[in-house]
């Protein structure tokens, strides 16, 4: 199973034993496919998935253009899988990143436990917020101003 999503999405959750191209954005995917082509037989079956199915359409088209003959995708993506498969029977581990204010969804399609860091715009959880590197506010007040409060 090929996870066509970006690496920060896969850190939140993915299918058991899936393969990630570890891309930071989808523009890197074509280069990864070219490398993959030199490593596996293009007749090998490739099943892929993404959040809602749109990236899989692009990814499968690209892979077919590169000569992969047996390319399949999860219809409707992860979100459709969550809706169709009982959590107890699921092969999914973790939550699913979404590109809206919810940041992540759990298997019941409810808002997950992740927030978006205001500094780096990456998903963060409660453990990340306890890190010394995490700063809640990006408003940096100079020392003289801070003393006047």
Task: Give the ranges of each region predicted by the language model.
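Positively charged, proline/Ser/Thr-rich regional signature most characteristic
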Residues: 1-44
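Catalytic cysteine-centered active loop of the rhodanese-like fold, especially the PTP/DSP P-loop
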Residues: 32-81
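Redox cofactor-anchoring modules in respiratory/redox and cofactor-processing assemblies
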Residues: 64, 75-119
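C-terminal accessory/binding modules appended to enzymatic or scaffolding proteins
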Residues: 116-124, 130
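Short cysteine-rich clusters marking metal-coordination/redox-active sites
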Residues: 117-120, 136-140
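Short, non-ligating residues that shape and space the ligands of small metal-coordination modules
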Residues: 126-127, 147
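Short linker/helix segments within small regulatory modules
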Residues: 128-137
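Residue-level detector of conserved catalytic or cofactor/ligand-binding positions
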Residues: 139-145, 149
């Amino acid at each position: 199973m090929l996870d066509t999503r970006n690496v920060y999405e896969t850190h939140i959750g993915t299918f058991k034993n899936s393969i990630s191209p570890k891309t930071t954005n989808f523009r890197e995917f074509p280069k990864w496919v070219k490398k993959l082509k030199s490593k596996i037989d293009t007749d090998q079956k490739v099943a892929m998935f993404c959040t809602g199915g749109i990236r899989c359409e692009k990814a499968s088209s690209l892979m077919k253009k590169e000569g992969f003959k047996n390319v399949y995708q999860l219809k409707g993506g992860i979100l459709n899988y969550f809706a169709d498969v009982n959590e107890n029977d699921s092969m999914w581990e973790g939550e699913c990143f979404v590109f809206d204010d919810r940041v992540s969804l759990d298997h019941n399609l409810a808002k997950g436990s992740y927030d978006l860091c205001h500094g780096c715009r990456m998903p963060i959880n409660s453990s990340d917020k306890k890190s010394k590197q995490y700063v809640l506010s990006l408003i940096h007040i100079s020392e003289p101003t801070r003393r006047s409060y």
